[in-house]
Amino acid sequence: MTSVCRSGQSIWRAAARGRRAGVAWPAACWIGVGLFALVSDAATKAWALSALRDGHQIAVPGGIVRLQLVANHGAGFGIGAGDESVVAVVSLALIIALGVWAARASTVAERLGGWLAVGGGLGNLVDRVVRPLGGLHGAVTDWIHVSFYRPTFNLADLWLRGGLLIAVVGWLWSRRRRQAPVPPAGDAG
């Protein structure tokens, strides 16, 4: 799949320049971005379930980050706790809508961010249904606690929020570029 995704410049450089997400990166590449987010989240959750069980915590040097296992039965910030099946159904609907939007997005940044967010959303949904803390009990495995940020979170949350941020910034940037006045032809400035 990597050979399919290659082009003359990196995806990051194209995203920074607001390039159109055309033929240079076929659908397989964008789905690969989502799969990368999903698999990396699953791997880190598997590690956390093994390394942080029985209340074990790891303090990262500097004291700002602490790794600890938390079962989150709700959505973001614990919203919806107690209604795990509703949270799962709503999550699935939002992931499908986000995937459709990401597939139709017009810029590299929008597609990149959209597919990262889809992978993150799927990571939490799969965790909610399959994993031991979830295991059809509806919980998501959270394991990263930052002292200045209230909820404990996981890599899927980072992919989801970071992806949405990249997509929104890309959309705003491309919108701004489309609205910018075009200099008259022959104007050397």
Residue ranges with predicted function:
Residues M1-G189:
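Alpha-helical transmembrane bundles and membrane-interface segments of multipass inner-membrane proteins
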